[in-house]
Amino acid sequence: MATSSSAWLIFSDHYREILIAIACLVVFSLLRSARSSSKGGLPYNWPIFGMLPAIISNNQFNDFTTARLRKMGWTFIFKGPWLLDMDYIFTCDPSNINHMFNDNFENYPKGELGKVFDIFGNNIFNADGDLWHDHRKMAQTILWDGNYRTMQATFIRNKMDNALIPILDSAACKRNPVDLQDVLLRFTFDTSCFSVLAADPESLTMEFPPVPFSKAADQALDAALTRHITPRLIWKLKRFFNVGSERTLAVAWKVIDSYIYDKIAELKAKRKLVGKINSYDAVSFYMDNFNIHDDKFLRDNAFTYLLAQRNTQSLTMTWLFYALFENPKVELKILSELKSIVDESSERKFNDGFALFDSNMIQSAIYLHATLCEALRIYPPVPFEIKDAHKADVLPSGHKVRAGEKILFSPYAMARMKGIWGDDCLEFKPERWITGNGTLKHEPAYKFFAFSAGPRICLGKELSFTQMKMVVATIIYNFHLQMVKGHVVEQSNSILMDMKHGLMVQVRKRSVM
């Protein structure tokens, strides 16, 4: 009996050693294959988990994706975990983007992806088909209305005069560093609230008060990103049990709804008290011009307008100033152009020694416009987007698309491909946007994707350019900004191209008048 037990122990020890040896061999082989695969361009396709671990473990998604797309000829297949329907086609090929947004537009609706962004409700962002066409017609009427544009330009000028300039002036006098990203986010939140809800939340003040809506909106977008990289079954279970990111989203959703519904109620109460008022904000426009008074409809569209204006404009301007810190010669060229405009303008706007640029003055600022284009090219506020294929298809790159398959395309990566933007694609070079005749150079939207492309191209493109030029021109002409020494600029892993640590700057007043 003892002999039998000893033999079994010896056998067990040998058996255990054999299993450990086999396990080590398997792990070693997988790691070697993973390294080999990585060198070849693709993330390693693990058993069961697919390529998802490579995405989850990487804290710079945009650069990670760019490197793979560069090695794989602008398009590759991303294999997700088994049985979870998470396979994607990653691409930055302009011909593929043109195909999805122009040539075969109807085959790539919002579809199932609208459920990922359900917090937006039923509006132009999530809608398809006839509903989308109706939303777009109404949005076009609002955004292209002369009174709406004049109201916005006037409010922006006043906000620069009464908030932006005093805060930067105070920072210069006290030599206190400020987070420029936070300043610009607050500025665009105030201006967007006024243009959408006829309300000024006054978030941009010397006190820098908490802004619950902005925090909630950022949390909602982060939750949407989590849904993108999480199996659908998992995030739906999290939503059902109200845990993790879905719990955060639910709380944020309540904050967002509370703010917007309250502002809609205030606007309606004011109109009921004094009768119809000459207000050209978006919500009033829906009520007056389209006879739409449904709170849910107004809430959904208001939320879309607020995020579109607040986030994209502020982040574009933030990255533009970062690019100027890295390329001071570009700033000098902009300043020279602005001096010429001020000298030639018959509409000089000065207050307490500061110049204010209005929408008329900056129309001739070609180099400033080109600089904004270059910032949008290299630092697109929405660095990637995702599409669903309604039916099976074949992309111009030759990749087959299954019905229901997702395609992730990266404007961020596209800007960094020599075959698309030339050997100098990594340089911040506004001159690429100016022709030999000194006029602005046009690039097709499927190559310069900052404002989308095809039938869904942004209706507020020119309005957005005008507003950003007013703000950037006013800041550059009156102040010289420098990034705080030692400050680290890093992208957040987010749906939007924001800076993880903000953009801390020192402010100094100029003497250029």
Curated annotation (Swiss-Prot):
The UniProt entry, under InterPro entries, shows: Cyt_P450, Cyt_P450_CS, Cyt_P450_E_grp-I, Cyt_P450_sf
Record's family?
A: Belongs to the cytochrome P450 family.
Q: What is the recorded name of this protein?
A: Noroxomaritidine synthase 1
What tissues harbor this protein?
Mostly expressed in stems, and, to a lower extent, in bulbs, roots, leaves and flowers.
Give me the segments passing through the membrane. Answer: 18-34
Q: What is the lineage of its organism?
A: Eukaryota, Viridiplantae, Streptophyta, Embryophyta, Tracheophyta
Q: Which GO terms describe its cellular component?
A: membrane
Q: Protein transport among the record's keywords?
A: no
Top class in the EC scheme: oxidoreductase
